[in-house]
Design a protein with these regions (language model features):
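A conserved regulatory-domain signal marking ACT and ACT-like small-molecule sensing domains
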Residues: 238-402
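Short hydrophobic alpha-helical runs that function as membrane-insertion/retention elements
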Residues: 167-171, 225-227, 289
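Nucleotide/pyrophosphate-binding catalytic subdomain
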Residues: 1-215, 382-383
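Short phosphate-binding/catalytic loops that engage adenosine nucleotides
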Residues: 33, 89, 223, 286, ...
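Surface-exposed amphipathic alpha-helical tracts and adjacent flexible/coil segments at the periphery
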Residues: 210, 221, 232-237, 312-313
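Acidic-aromatic/histidine active-site loop/patch
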Residues: 218
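Terminal amphipathic helices with adjacent charged low-complexity linkers/tails
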Residues: 39-46, 227-244, 299-300, 305
Length: 402
């Protein structure tokens, strides 16, 4: 069997944890399996690199930031390979250039295009554990790029797909996927399994266990995912196409406090205006989520939407640059908000799910500012100060602890 194992920064934060990961991988290796390990930067090292960069230049070029960021993962993989050597197991560390991990040229948020697996396969044939840098790639100009938030998850899934691995195991500081963040909802329960679609929505909406791009890729290529803890040997949660047990009405509740709302006031109420608005944002690679259009005054309309907090400055700058083309009157932004979502394939065949969610929020005195729905998701925008209380109320309303 070929197993890809990805470990995040907290899992390799110090010597003790590095050896904990190494011993776990050696156990797999000694079963006769091929092992590829994908690592993030150690602990909070990426934050340290950001601080160092901003001390030199408060607006550092994105290309140079990508070059700097690659140091973190390269440190992790080289130290891990040294740990394997100390344990008497042959291993080799490889960075994105050595693996030939080809990406687009969008610095800070590149997309993987293809992976040349020849080097990895050659090392596996030589009975080595292969330790690969997550989060990074190389563009057509041979410049380093980074894959953005959750990039190491994406690297692991992409490698698993390219190598036709038997499984891709994502190790975190929690032991699986829960019905809610157990740090915010003490009654949260671990799920044995969840569908790709449910996990994708939860990941997109704030559940930090897996990144949405990695789930998209796993679904596209049919990569079996397992989310497990790096600190214990519990079974974890399997993410797959279909669950084998009866679908739950609701699989989970997610809270995203990183979102911000932007309101574009006084747009002309004519065909194509929404397209023009979101097209200028798309060209800057800014993702929008919850969207609300309302009637303005005297032949105008207002459009509100949410973006990730890190994209706020770019979004505002882009809209201001295009004010003449868009013809809006005012621009407002709001930070102290939260997106609260419920996700579950079971809601497709059960009416009244949204009403039950709204009732639980009403009973808690939580005001809803915006609403967005899909077949398996309901999302509301609320005040950030109400977020955790609302999350627990909704979790209780759907009896997710049982």
């Amino acid at each position: 069997m070929l197993i890809v194992k990805k470990f995040g920064g907290t899992s390799v934060a110090n010597k003790e944890r590095i050896y904990n990961v190494a011993n776990r991988c050696v156990e797999e290796y000694k079963k006769g399996n091929d092992v590829v390990v994908v690592l993030s930067a150690m602990g909070k090292y990426t934050d340290e690199l950001i601080s160092m960069a901003e001390d030199i230049n408060d607006k550092p070029p994105k290309r140079e930031m990508d070059m700097l960021f690659t140091i973190g993962e390269q440190m992790s993989v080289s130290l891990m390979a040294m740990a394997f050597d100390k344990l008497g197991v042959p291993a080799v560390s490889l960075n994105a250039f050595q693996v030939a991990m080809h990406t687009t040229s969008v610095h800070g948020n590149a997309r993987l295009k293809r992976i040349d697996t020849e080097r990895i396969r050659r090392e596996l044939e030589n009975h080595k554990i292969v330790v690969v840098t997550g989060f990074q790639g190389v563009n057509k100009y041979d410049d380093y790029t980074t894959l953005g938030r959750g990039g190491s998850d994406t690297t692991a899934v992409a490698l698993a797909a390219a190598l036709h691995a038997d499984a891709c195991e994502i190790y975190t500081d929690v032991d699986g996927v829960y019905t809610a963040d157990p740090r915010k909802v003490p009654k949260a329960r671990k799920l044995k399994e969840i569908t790709y679609d449910e996990m994708l929505d939860l990941a997109t909406l704030g559940a930090g266990v897996l990144h949405n791009r990695s789930v998209e890729m796993a679904k596209k290529y049919g990569v079996p995912l397992v989310v497990r803890s790096s600190l214990n040997n519990s079974e974890g949660t399997v993410v797959k196409e279909e669950v084998t047990v009866e679908r739950m009405l609701i699989s989970g509740v997610a809270l995203d406090t990183e979102a911000v709302r932007i309101a574009v006031i006084g747009l002309k109420d004519v065909p194509g205006m929404a397209f023009k608005l979101f097209d200028v944002l798309a060209k800057k690679h800014i993702n929008v989520d919850v969207i609300l259009q309302s009637i303005g005054s005297a032949g105008t309309k207002d459009i509100s939407f949410t973006v990730d907090g890190k994209d706020l400055d770019d979004a505002i700058a882009t809209l201001e640059e295009n004010k003449a083309r868009l013809g809006y009157q005012e621009l407002h932004s709001e930070r102290n908000i939260a997106k609260l979502s419920i996700v579950g394939a079971g809601m497709m065949s059960n009416p009244g799910v949204a009403a039950k969610m709204f009732e639980s929020l009403y009973n808690e005195g939580v005001n809803i500012n915006m609403i967005s729905t899909s077949e398996i998701r309901v999302t509301v925008l609320i005040n950030e100060k109400d977020g955790v209380r609302a999350m627990n109320a909704v979790h209780d309303a759907f009896n997710l602890a049982d």
